[in-house]
A protein has these predicted regions:
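Anion-recognition interface
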Residues: 2-270
Length: 270
């Protein structure tokens, strides 16, 4: 079979929109499609070229690498169809901040994101319309646009939209709706951030493409961070939390500028 004749579907995340659940509990259970897991993403192009399945599903969640990765896959397989999931901006940025916090970043939320656009996370990182423009730039096919909230509210409707779009099948009895990774509490994250601000000023580097360095230089810190957060579970809340991890009023005011961006997503979501 020619590569141009193969049906290819590319789930691009975003990160913190239920991607891990899909990658662990749903995509491997789909029938009539070859799923290339996130752990094999780095060689997915070679896998597709060297095998002869009728259709393929690739999955990997992106944020700042979004355009680079979309361009890379579409350059090899222009027929690729995109699956993208968005989440309401306030919930999404909060979840992103917590993810970075548990990985050793000890800055405040205001330094992570602020209205002056001087934080680590910038306005261009927040605009979903920019990501939709990137998809339209490289793909001629209509993407499947989903909302993370629907996965929570009506999971089987959400999952069926993916199976229908990809021409695959699944059995409800095969799908576990259990959360794959539970979230850490505010108390645990604040305690870890205090620890890192004293003992680990710079977060450990993540070696995605080098397993040896990953296990030698990153994994020990990862294990220690988890131990610290586990320890925090047994400490009094009043001892740790002096102020909220994220100020809700500040968050609400900061996110108002993205109301129209979210309305655009609601108007095009499937």
């Amino acid at each position: 079979m020619k590569n141009s004749e193969k049906e290819i579907y590319f789930h691009v995340g975003l990160a913190k929109t239920g991607s891990t659940f899909l990658q662990n509990n749903f995509f491997p259970k789909l029938k009539d499609i070859k799923y290339i897991s996130t752990h094999k993403y780095w060689r997915c192009i070679n896998i597709i070229k060297r095998t002869n399945y009728k259709s393929y599903l690739i999955s990997r969640e992106f944020d700042r690498q979004f355009e680079f990765e979309v361009k890379k896959i579409l350059k090899e397989f222009p027929q690729t169809k995109i699956i993208v999931v968005f989440r309401k901006h306030d919930k999404w940025i909060s979840s992103q901040f917590k993810r970075y916090s548990k990985n050793g970043y000890h800055w405040s939320f205001e330094k992570f994101y602020n209205n002056d656009n001087t934080g680590f996370w910038r306005k261009e990182d927040m605009l979903y319309s920019i990501k939709m423009d990137i998809i339209k730039k490289y793909s001629k096919n209509k993407p499947l646009v989903l909302r993370f909230e629907e996965l929570k509210e009506n999971p089987y409707s959400y999952l069926s939209k993916i199976s229908n779009y990809t021409g695959s099948r699944y059995s409800k009895s095969d799908i576990s709706l259990n959360v794959v990774h539970g979230s850490w509490s505010e108390k645990q994250l604040i305690f870890l951030k205090k620890f890192c601000s004293i003992f680990k000023k710079n977060p450990p580097e993540y070696y995605a493409n080098n397993k040896i360095l990953h296990w030698l230089l990153y994994r020990p810190w990862w294990l220690l961070f988890h131990f610290i957060m586990y320890l925090a579970y047994f400490l009094p809340k009043s001892y740790i939390i002096k102020k909220p991890l994220i100020d809700k009023e500040y968050l609400s005011k900061s996110m108002k500028k993205y109301d129209n961006d979210w309305k655009k997503i609601l108007s095009i979501s499937d």
